[in-house]
Curated annotation (Swiss-Prot):
It comes from Mus musculus (Mouse). Regulatory subunit of the voltage-gated potassium (Kv) channel which, when coassembled with KCNB1, modulates the kinetics parameters of the heterotetrameric channel namely the inactivation and deactivation rate. Potassium channel subunit that does not form functional channels by itself. Reduces the deactivation rate. Moderately acceleratee activation. The gene is Kcng3. This is Voltage-gated potassium channel regulatory subunit KCNG3. The chain crosses the membrane at residues 166-187, 218-239, 251-271, 282-302, 318-339, 385-413. InterPro entries: BTB/POZ_dom, Ion_trans_dom, K_chnl_volt-dep_Kv, K_chnl_volt-dep_Kv5/Kv9, SKP1/BTB/POZ_sf, T1-type_BTB, VG_K_chnl, Volt_channel_dom_sf. It is a multi-pass membrane protein. It is found in: Cell membrane; Cytoplasm.
């Protein structure tokens, strides 16, 4: 067929059931490359390379594409507004439609370009983690297959709490150890607990008892928990595919930070036998033992909510930095003004609580976050007016990035939940084979 020489004066484009009539002259210089290519087609074979089907009698070209997306694209190329995403349509799907018709990402409005970049970045990260979790090195020979399969099952049992019944039991036991260790840590700081422990030992053995934390009931429980965490960490390191990647993971670094202080404190008590040396090391020992609080972060391995929180903070670091800048700027302004109004003017009602700007910063941050301890407050009329403005400003500033953080949290939650469900299905099918 030859366009522009005889025949019908117009052609019909049928895109997903929606029909559009175009003149031949308009078709020749049409902004969409795929549509304009129809003008140069000389045979039906050339036409079918451009569209999905062709009706010679009605001179109609069929495209099995998204009709609503093409409608938005057609409005854009005709000069009616700017190109934005179609409602209720995935950004990546709309972008694929743009590529099909011959447009690029640069044709999108800036806000839509940012949405597309964020979605492509998230999808790339998601698929990279997916491929990393799916890839399995092939065994060298038939004899290596059973051991490789066993190591893979062990790795997934320790890494994926929802992969099997054994993984769920192991995760439950680990959670119990974390909870027990946290309860013992909190109880060991109670005055009644320490008094009861001191009454059960003799005065002569008190120094040796203090130097050996394993002799206390709480020390015994701590040693058992540390033993479990250490064994779990070692096994997970042995069965991991990539040892370097294992060491770099944030949760594994937290495990190391939670376990190492115990062994350091044990070594310090062994090498500081004299009481004077022990007293000098007492503060260090208490700090190291208090680092057991990091164990609570181990729960992130077993609870999707904590994983969602960490992933949200990672993706929203720009919004968090913006929030921090807002707070710092407002705190600098309000602290300087409050110090001037309450103390710097040397009035008879000088407020000593606002003697310096750093002291006023405490009042500003407490007021902006609407906590209001009441330990210090303005007493002058201008200071109270400034306090009201400070509170309202804090509410507004804190609310600005909340929308971005909320949407990111919901997106991260659905991604992690979908990934967990997919692992459960794939692993169940694999273990049944």
């Amino acid at each position: 067929m030859t366009f522009g020489r005889g025949g019908a004066a117009s052609v019909v484009l049928n895109v997903g059931g929606a029909r559009y009539s175009l003149s031949r002259e308009l078709l020749k210089d049409f902004p969409l490359r795929r549509v304009s290519r129809l003008h140069g087609c000389r045979s039906e074979r050339d036409v079918l390379e451009v569209c999905d089907d062709y009706d010679r009698e009605r001179n109609e070209y069929f495209f099995d594409r998204h009709s609503e997306a093409f409608g938005f694209i057609l409005l854009y190329v005709r000069g009616h507004g700017k190109l934005r995403f179609a409602p209720r349509m995935c950004e990546l799907s709309f972008y694929n439609e743009m590529i099909y018709w011959g447009l690029e990402g640069a044709h999108l409005e800036y806000c839509c370009q940012r949405r597309l970049d964020d979605r492509m970045s998230d999808t790339h990260t998601f698929h990279a983690a997916d491929e990393l979790g799916r890839e399995q090195p092939r065994p060298a020979g038939p004899e290596a297959a059973p051991s490789r399969r066993w190591l893979e099952r062990m790795r997934r049992t320790f890494e994926e709490p929802t992969s099997s019944l054994a993984a769920q039991i192991l995760a439950s036991v680990s959670v119990v150890f974390v909870i027990v260790s946290m309860v013992v840590l909190c109880a060991s700081t109670l005055p009644d607990w320490r008094a009861a422990v001191a009454d059960n030992r003799s005065l002569d053995d008190r120094s040796r008892y203090s130097a050996s934390p394993g002799r206390e009931p709480s020390g015994i429980i701590e040693a058992i928990c540390i033993g479990w965490f250490t064994a779990e960490c070692i096994v997970r390191f042995i069965v991991s595919k990539n040892k370097c990647e294992f060491v770099k993971r944030p949760l594994n670094i937290i495990d190391l930070l939670a376990i190492t202080p115990y062994y350091i404190s044990v070594l310090m008590t062994v090498f500081t036998g004299e009481n004077s040396q022990l007293q000098r090391a007492g503060v260090t020992l208490r700090v190291l033992r208090m680092m057991r609080i990091f164990w609570v972060i181990k729960l992130a391995r077993h609870f999707i909510g904590l994983q969602t929180l960490g992933l949200t903070l990672k993706r929203c670091y720009r919004e968090m930095a913006m929030l921090l800048v807002f707070i710092c700027v407002a705190m600098a302004i309000f602290s300087a003004l409050s110090q001037l109004l309450e103390h710097g003017l040397d009035l008879e009602t000088s407020n000593k609580d606002f003697a310096s700007i750093p002291a006023a910063c405490w009042w500003v941050i407490i007021s902006m976050t609407t906590v209001g301890y009441g330990d210090m407050y303005p007493i002058t009329v201008p200071g109270r007016i400034l306090g009201g403005v400070c509170v309202v400003s804090g509410i507004v500033l804190l609310a600005l990035p909340i929308t971005f953080i909320y949407h990111s949290f919901v997106q991260c939650y659905h991604e992690l939940k979908f990934r967990s469900a997919r692992y459960s299905r794939s692993l169940s099918a694999e273990f049944l084979n």
